[in-house]
Amino acid sequence: MAGYDHDSRIVMTLDAGGTSFRFSAMRGNKRITDTVTTPSNGDNLKKCLGNIVGGFTEIKNKCPRPPVAISFAFPGPADYPAGIIGDLPNLPAFRGGIALGPMLEHTFRVPVTINNDGELFAYGEAIAGFLPYVNGLLEKAGSLKRFKNLFGVTLGTGFGGGIARGGELLTGDNSNASQIWLTRHKFLDKTNVEEGVSIRAIRRVYAEEAGIPVADVPDPRVIEQIAIGEVSGNRTAAVEAYRRLGEVAGNAMANALALIDGLAVIGGGLSKGWRLFLPALIAEMNDSYVAPNGESFRRLPQPAFNLEDPAQMKTFLKGKTRAITVPGLKRKIKYDSLQRVGVGLSRLGTSEAIAIGAYAFALRKLDALKR
């Protein structure tokens, strides 16, 4: 997958949070300006839009040459290709359809692309992060195997997702692709999976296991420290909170990879606790179904490997390569019979991956228009 490490074009981008907006500019997959931060004023549309225009104006003035595009992640629901933002829970001033993209195109006279953060995270990791990292290791190991497809998830306030397939971002016909958070919770069949894979899920399970009110539960970073013995608290409850997150996430991700058949990369604030949940996540992905006749079979035909585990990484890279004879000929060819998928952590960091994804998405769109 071609990257843009040496591209001289500049793209302005935005990290849109519920309380603040952070603006910057990218060139060659790197930030070239200081970050400009403004309040979101999400309950006042005029102020909110004014802050967005003002932030991009300030960044434009900091750029060494005129930007060629604006590209950023913004919450949904939205018609992202049209640049129209729908009714947002965290920015209540957005109601009835706000044509943010067309407004910015008119103001700055450059193309504007908007996507959700989970999709741009996956795209950034596919362009310059986890996907080329793993393929580089496979090449160095002399393996025949290469991956083209990547499923990215972010674990934090929610459970976000994105799919990069063969160098392209899968966005869907309604801007609703990769909505992993809407799949079913493994243990609560009337509940979506995000209630088991999020900050609130970690706190809720800790409260249940420790027998205390949720209001008295610390944040997940402290729960992580309790689990590894760095901070006093109910260690059993802390370990179970992260283990269960891994099991629930692994169930959802196994369903996704049954369709995608590629690598999976994990980002977001909760990914820092990977040592506590990744083993359970991988175990769930490698679990089996039971047929009506009592026989078991793998839920994924291809084994899933924890690529943060050196021993599993070694097996993953080695594969099972042997020489086979072409029927009717004396010629032999190499064959790697180990079908496999791998799961690992972001190599860029979540925010950086989103920014690189936004940069690459804008430039690919510009390049496509030239053809």
Residue positions per predicted region:
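ATP-binding/phosphotransfer module of carbohydrate and carboxylate kinases, centering on a glycine-rich
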Residues: 1-68, 80-82, 106-110, 139-142, ...
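Phosphate-binding/catalytic loop of phosphoryl-transfer enzymes
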Residues: 69-71, 77-192, 196, 200, ...
